[in-house]
């Protein structure tokens, strides 16, 4: 039996003298890092890696990420084949020094009734674009009336970086940039956002469009158990005809499994070190420790860990036979992080435009 863990955010994006995991008890993770075979690949967008895992060839072209993410939304019906979609996620724009930056909203910050009012206003004002809808307070969609002839950057690429470097590109770039400006005016003046600002809360004063593409059939993946909470990964799995359930280590140990653990992704993107440390300590207890024990007992034949991040992707492979190689010493995560080059913040580095 083999398990493949995908853990975006495990590689802390910033380089610092004091390691981000300093003081954490990560005995099992250090054992896995020391016992296994490690390699490090250059940066590749997370969505491209997920697509390849689900059977999409490298030359599959622009993937319909919005349609796939929407397919993975438990609260919404599957999008019809041939429909065009964009993710239209609410964000907050603010100035930091001379740059306009954006930040996203956690799932519990925007109230459902406020979201409903904002969505209704957008549909009243921008009906020519298509139809807006919200799956959750922080995940919105636009079903396009006509295809978008532009390239968009995923939201996670733009978080915390100058917005001007991640604006739409391509044939209709100016149209979409103008549309975003018009949306910002409507959202800024909306009573919901006026009330939020008056109360000292962040306004949802813009939308971030990404994931353009037509909903279409996907390649069939090799049958295996897939565990994921992330709606994009759920969409990839469902499109490939796979069953997908929430991550659970005990169930993963019952059969060959592909597991996406995105607990560390948002804290790493936002450089939220406290949340990252708390969640990493939990992963040590709920995943790394039981998987290390399963390797030692030979209940698990092999474990692969892929950790995509801005600094590249760590690939780790540990076999049950490696457990008895006593000369291999544990490798603390902070020691590994110090050996990895800093991330390149340029938009060219984030070449997975969608």
What feature does the model see in each segment?
Residues 1-4:
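Extreme N-terminal starter segment of soluble prokaryotic enzymes
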Residues 106-134, 190-201, 205-206:
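Extended, Lys/Arg-enriched charged tracts that mediate electrostatic binding to polyanionic substrates
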Residues 130, 136-152, 187:
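Glycine-rich, mobile lid/loop segments that gate access to catalytic sites or pores
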Residues 11-17:
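Short N-terminal binding/cap micro-motifs at the start of the first secondary-structure element
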Residues 223-354:
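C-terminal structured domains
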Residues 22-25, 112-120, 179, 183-186, ...:
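Well-ordered, non-membrane alpha-helical segments in soluble/globular domains
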Residues 147-218:
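Loop-centered beta-sheet repeat module
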Residues 18-114:
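An N-terminal, globular interaction/scaffold subdomain
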């Amino acid at each position: 039996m083999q398990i493949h863990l995908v853990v975006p955010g495990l590689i802390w994006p910033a380089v610092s003298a004091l390691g981000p995991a300093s003081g954490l008890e990560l005995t099992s993770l250090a054992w896995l890092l020391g016992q296994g075979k490690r390699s490090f690949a250059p940066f590749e967008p997370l969505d491209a890696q997920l697509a390849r895992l689900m059977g999409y060839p490298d030359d599959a072209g622009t993937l319909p990420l919005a349609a796939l993410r929407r397919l993975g939304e438990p609260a919404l019906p599957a999008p019809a084949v041939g429909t065009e979609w964009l993710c239209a996620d609410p964000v907050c724009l603010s100035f930091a020094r001379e740059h306009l930056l954006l930040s996203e909203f956690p799932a519990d910050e925007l109230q459902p009734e406020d979201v409903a009012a904002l969505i209704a206003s957008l549909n009243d004002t921008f009906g020519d674009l298509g139809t807006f809808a919200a799956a959750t307070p922080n995940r919105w969609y636009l079903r396009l009336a006509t295809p978008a002839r532009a390239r968009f950057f995923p939201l996670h690429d733009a978080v915390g970086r100058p917005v001007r470097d991640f604006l739409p590109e391509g044939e209709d770039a100016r149209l979409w940039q103008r549309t975003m400006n018009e949306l910002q005016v409507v959202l800024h003046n909306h009573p919901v956002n006026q009330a939020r600002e008056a109360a000292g809360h962040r306004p949802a004063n813009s939308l971030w469009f990404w994931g353009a593409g037509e909903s279409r059939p996907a390649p069939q993946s090799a049958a295996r158990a897939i565990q994921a909470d992330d709606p994009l990964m759920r969409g990839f799995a469902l499109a490939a005809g796979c069953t997908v359930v929430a991550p659970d280590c005990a169930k993963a140990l019952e059969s060959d499994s592909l597991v996406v653990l995105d607990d560390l992704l948002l804290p790493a993107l936002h450089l939220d070190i406290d949340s990252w440390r708390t969640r990493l300590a939990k992963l040590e207890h709920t995943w790394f420790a039981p998987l290390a024990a399963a390797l030692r007992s030979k209940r698990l034949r092999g474990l692969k860990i892929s950790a995509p991040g801005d600094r590249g992707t760590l690939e780790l492979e540990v076999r049950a036979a490696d457990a008895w190689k006593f000369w291999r010493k544990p490798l603390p995560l902070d020691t590994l992080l110090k050996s990895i080059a800093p991330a390149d913040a340029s938009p060219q580095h984030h070449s997975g435009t969608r």
